Each structure stands twice: as structure tokens, then as C-alpha cells.
Amino acid sequence: MEKFPMTPRGFEKLKEELRWRQQSERPRIIEAIAEARAHGDLSENAEYHAAKEAQSLNEGRINELEDLVARAEVIDVSKLTGDRIKFGATVTMIDEDTEEEKIYQIVGDQEADVKEGRISISSPIARALIGKGEGDTIEVNAPGGSRSYEIIALKFV
């Protein structure tokens, strides 16, 4: 079973979704199926078929979440140190073309959210950052073309 890195925050969000799907969503769907069954003929009962589809999707996601929770390697980022970028690092960098400052934390694939400044460890930017330090410059090939960034700060929080 292959482990994958995850922050405590990301792990808690996974467990929270799993609990919600098991304890709230599953009973709601079961009740919707029972209610739709009470309407009679199941062959032409759209409510029944919709509820069964919702059940299938929910159970699939529960199985996926259980697998992710079992394989997660939770890494407490606040205990990490060093002057090189690795999983969990929060990196401040400057786009050398636009002078725009960007701040990203490198996190696991399941918890990445660019809008919140969390990028996946397997993303092109993170792969370019790993192993680098303050003052280094990276080149990232993105869909919009190649971009250069200077790393100006690195911390583990």
C-alpha cells in the first residue's frame, strides 16, 4: 500500500468528509430510497433511480476516502526545519516578469487548492521548487508559457 504525504489540516478535512458521508449523507439517501419505493412501480420511478444513483456515488466516495485515510502519511509541518524546500514548506517568490509576489504551501495532492495558496507536491511549480532555497531562481513551464520565479522566503508553519 503506497503512502502519500498530507498535512494534519488536510487529513482532518478528509476525515470530516468521510464522517459526513457516513453519518449524514448515507442515512439521508437511504430514507430517500425508502420514500421513493413507497410510491410504487420502480421501473418508471425517477426519484428512486436518482436516489439509487446518489447512493452509488456516495458509497464510491466513502470507499475512496477510507482508502485515502488509510494510506495518508500525516506530516506535522510545524516540526519541519531546514533551508531547502520540501513537502510542507511555505514559499514566497517573485514572478520575474510581472514582479508579482506569490505565496504557496506545498501540500499533498488531495488537499491542494491554488485559490487558498496550497499547491500539490506533484504540480509543475512544486516539482521545480523541491530542493531549492532562498535566492534561487526556478523556471516553470506552464500552459501559458515559461515563467521564472525568484525564491525570496521559505518557512515551515
Curated annotation (Swiss-Prot):
GO BP: DNA-templated transcription elongation; regulation of DNA-templated transcription elongation
Keyword vocabulary terms for this entry: DNA-binding, Transcription, Transcription regulation
Any one Gene Ontology molecular-function term assigned to this protein's record: DNA binding
InterPro entries per the UniProt record, alphabetical: GreA/GreB_C_sf (IPR036953), TF_GreA/GreB_CS (IPR018151), Tscrpt_elong_fac_GreA (IPR006359), Tscrpt_elong_fac_GreA/B (IPR028624), Tscrpt_elong_fac_GreA/B_C (IPR001437), Tscrpt_elong_fac_GreA/B_fam (IPR023459), Tscrpt_elong_fac_GreA/B_N (IPR022691), Tscrpt_elong_fac_GreA/B_N_sf (IPR036805)
Protein's name according to its UniProt entry: Transcription elongation factor GreA
Recorded superkingdom: Bacteria
Presence of keyword DNA-binding: yes
Function: Necessary for efficient RNA polymerase transcription elongation past template-encoded arresting sites. The arresting sites in DNA have the property of trapping a certain fraction of elongating RNA polymerases that pass through, resulting in locked ternary complexes. Cleavage of the nascent transcript by cleavage factors such as GreA or GreB allows the resumption of elongation from the new 3'terminus. GreA releases sequences of 2 to 3 nucleotides.
Family as reported in the entry's similarity comment: Belongs to the GreA/GreB family.
